[in-house]
Amino acid sequence: MTGCVPRSWRPWFLRSGAMLACFLATGAAAQISIDIDETQRISFESGNFDVRRYSGEMQGVSYFVDNKLVMTADQIDLETGGQPKEGSFFVKSLEVINAEITGEDLLFSSAIARNVDFGVLLGEHSPVRNVSFDAGAAGFFDDSFLQVLGIEFSDELATVTVGNVETLDFVFDQLPTGERYARNGGLLIDDLRFDLGTVNREFKELADTLAARGLRAAEFDFAVSQIANFVGGELRAEHAFNLVMDEMASLELVSGFEVKLATLVALESMAAQGRAKESEMLNLIGGIELASLNATYLDAGLVDTLVDVMAAEQNVSPAEMRSSLRSMLTQTLEGMLPRNGRRMARPLETLLKQGGGLEVSVRPQQPIILSNFLGFLIMPDLALEQLGVTITHLRDQ
């Protein structure tokens, strides 16, 4: 794990974070309105803000770009370590209350930050810099904390609400070469809900079928976390991903990786230089090994719902659909994996027939270099055997 923020979410966080950092770094003294530059302006209705300390409070805040309102907030309370310096803007505490990003249909009820260097955080989020093992956590410290509550955003396809997003406890340490790494870190997201908006005509029948079975919205809780330690000349990291779909299913994924010290140093060097060649990145794969992987899926109605939906679409009974799926699954796996297909298919068939859950385990006799996975694609049967892959059906509790 290179940080605590999933990569696919970074553009949204960075766009909002960059705008907020520019917003706060300008200062506001006692004026009602301040021109930041030729295009940006901040105004607030009341408050007490000390531009020398870059600290204070503002109420009724508005942020404009090219005279267009971009963001509003009921209140902002800010305490910093002083004026921004080159590449650094340390925020001791920040609270933003009832903010709205205008034109984006995005708002949140509260955002809190403690002991975060926003200058470093925003400066480290280029694609090249993210090759660094620590880049995703740049700007954070052992006592850092971020939390956003009551997030809402929508478009014509869906409305998304998030009850709570917060960072888990950070613990940082140093490699023998002096580079920093995160021993502990992570992100927690509670009450993530997708409500379908306008459904395209070709999907309306499916949406109606799902709604009839109680799936008018999808609700999730999930967390990602990392535990890492430097042992015997390599960094051993365990990453965990937990996902719960309310009253439907849950998934836990735990992986273990081992990264050679020379590889970590090379990653840091690439990040510092601001460049990375594809050939260099491929060579580094030889220093990263998969030690273990375990996935546990527990079903609490999701499989039944999906089978019912497919049966309704094909105008057959759920029992017929289950039988058809089991046959298709067995034929497909036996065709792809002549030696192991039947063994892999059996627990999946049992899940379709009886419910319950699945545990997929990868336990190689010794850690597998990631570059070997290219060869495994050509010989999948051999891959399963060398990786020690097993699938076990879990009975319904």
Protein language model features and the residues they cover:
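Sec-dependent signal peptide recognition
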Residues: R10-M19
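N-terminal signal peptide c-region/cleavage motif recognized by signal peptidases
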Residues: A25-G27
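Glycine-rich, small/hydroxylated-residue low-complexity segments
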Residues: Q31-Q397
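N-terminal secretory signal peptides that target proteins for export/translocation
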Residues: M1-P11
